[in-house]
Amino acid sequence: MDEETGGVGKDSRFPSGMTTRKATAKATASAKATANAKISAKAGAPVELTVLQTLHQRIAGCKQCPRLREYGENIGRVKRRAYIDQEYWAKPVPGFGDENARIQIVGLAPGAHGANRTGRPFTGDGAGNFMYPVLHELGLANHGNAVSRDDGLKLKHTWIGSVVRCAPPGDKPTPAEVRNCAAHFAAESAALSKVKVVVALGKIAWDGFLAHMLNAGVIERRSAYTFRHGAEYRLPNGIWLVGSYHPSLRNTNTGRLNKVMFAKVFVRARELAGLR
């Protein structure tokens, strides 16, 4: 739903209760095991995987939500006429960007014919066509043309992910599906240890992020943090939360969100992250 409008333990930024803690611990242990087992990348030797790369293999193979997997796979078989000759990713979509990111962008879920097709957040749809050129203009991306995983796009100081990793029917995941995905979001976010600013695209992403903070004991109540475009709050753990309208075609075509408004959010995010 790239088109939608809308660490573990006490010191972690993004856990969501015991279920998430256990899942995150499992993911971390798996990553450490992989790191310990590999040898240096000499000629003919396996390439070293980072913690995030190992986690992303787990995310792409997740089958906790049969309804979402079935929907994404079916979309990949039926396809949209414009993409009839393309092979769809049609599985959970990992995050993307700079592993040393200081800015973390949070969306809701992959678009059925966007990230569910290309396998990368906000890639191959109208929202990405609006967002990536702005990131490029602000020095957060090496170019602004996001069409596929092999288009050479690289982010700088920035990471993009979502609170749900599979494309949901009608752009509406169930509460249980959101909870199932919380462990992936927590583990991925915990690995992004240098993040200073979280930019939530739309109220649903905003609420999803705050739910993690509430379950982690970082905040006492979500109602203290009201969503609006340009809203910013410094959370008790030192992370800045910044809000933006989602760059959906619904918002950009109606003028609710324009590039000047969107760019201002990321200019401010850069400042809060210490990127002058």
What is the predicted role of each segment?
Residues 1-50:
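Intrinsic disorder/low-complexity segments
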Residues 47-276:
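A polyanion-binding, active-site-adjacent surface
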